[in-house]
Amino acid sequence: MRAHIYVSGLVQGVFFRASMQEVARSLGVNGWVRNLPDGRVEAVLEGEEGAVLKVIEWARRGPPLARVERVDVEWEEYRGEFRDFYIKYR
């Protein structure tokens, strides 16, 4: 399963990316996460359906300092292009 997500709210400067990386890796989900110039966080998640859904559910709360307002999910065809979950810097 593959999901492309956009997380809105207070999600930058609150360890969102590092926390998502930790959660995704613990669940065996591959892909990436990055900050966007408009203040949102963008991520691509690939893995088993249940694991991807758990990362999305986590993103709806985020780490303790985050204030998530919205998570938009776009479902995409699985590509299997990632071997790890990493933080992209632009």
Swiss-Prot record:
Q: Which domain of life is it from?
A: Archaea
Residues covered by the Acylphosphatase-like domain: 2-89
Q: What class of enzyme is it?
A: hydrolase
Q: Name one Pfam family in it.
A: Acylphosphatase
Q: Which UniProt keywords apply?
A: Hydrolase
- Does the keyword Electron transport feature in the UniProt annotation? no
Give this protein's Gene Ontology molecular function annotations: acylphosphatase activity
Q: What is its EC number?
A: 3.6.1.7
Task: From the UniProt record, list the reaction(s) this protein catalyses.
Answer: an acyl phosphate + H2O = a carboxylate + phosphate + H(+)
Q: Which residues form the active site?
A: R17, N35
Question: Belongs to which family?
Answer: Belongs to the acylphosphatase family.
**This protein is called what?**
Acylphosphatase
